[in-house]
Curated annotation (Swiss-Prot):
Heterotetramer of either two alpha-B chains or two alpha-C chains and two beta chains. The two major hemoglobins, B and C, associate upon deoxygenation to form a trimer of tetramers, BC2, that has a much lower affinity for oxygen than either component alone. InterPro entries: Globin, Globin-like_sf, Globin/Proto, Hemoglobin_a-typ, Hemoglobin_oxygen_transport. This is Hemoglobin subunit alpha-B. Transmembrane segments: none annotated. The alpha-B chain is a component of adult hemoglobin B. GO terms for biological process: hydrogen peroxide catabolic process. O2 binds at Q59. PANTHER family: HEMOGLOBIN FAMILY MEMBER, HEMOGLOBIN SUBUNIT ZETA. It holds the Pfam family Globin. Red blood cells.
Length: 142
């Protein structure tokens, strides 16, 4: 999926805003996912997924750090996310529909915490980016 110059700018800008707060923002995105889609908790049965848990904070940070890595590799998402894609498809066997659910919650968190930066154009760019990340992650399911 090609990204325009303005897409790249907006993706990079939003990631720079997110990067210092990956634990907090990631935790909120994960908690929103679990609250709005409780069935997603089944993939984390080995963790304490209650509000404020260290496990949710760590998982959220892991997710957002992977997104940060992807944001620096927009032209090579397949290579950048290959190991993560393999893990989700073959080891964790996560329902690929859950990627979309998490992406939606990440967008909600961005809109809440960065309203000045989350313009309609930035929203569209980051949504496009997260869709490309999701598509890359579930590419190994085929």
């Amino acid at each position: 999926m090609p990204f325009s110059a303005s897409d790249r700018h907006d993706i990079t800008h939003l990631w720079e805003k997110m990067a210092p707060n990956v634990e907090f923002l990631g935790e909120e995105a994960m908690e929103r996912l679990f609250k709005s889609h409780p069935k997603t908790k089944t993939y984390f049965s080995h963790l304490n997924v209650e509000h404020g848990s260290a496990a949710v904070r760590a998982q959220g940070a892991k997710v957002l750090n992977a997104i940060g890595h992807a944001s620096k590799n927009l032209d090579h998402l397949d290579e950048a996310l290959s190991n993560l894609s393999d893990k989700h498809a073959h080891d964790l066997r996560v329902d690929p529909g859950n990627f979309h659910l998490l992406c939606h919650n990440i967008l909600v968190v961005l809109a809440i915490h960065f309203p000045e930066d989350f313009t309609p154009r930035a929203h569209a760019a980051f949504d496009k980016f997260l869709a490309a990340v999701s598509e890359t992650l579930y590419s190994k399911y085929r």
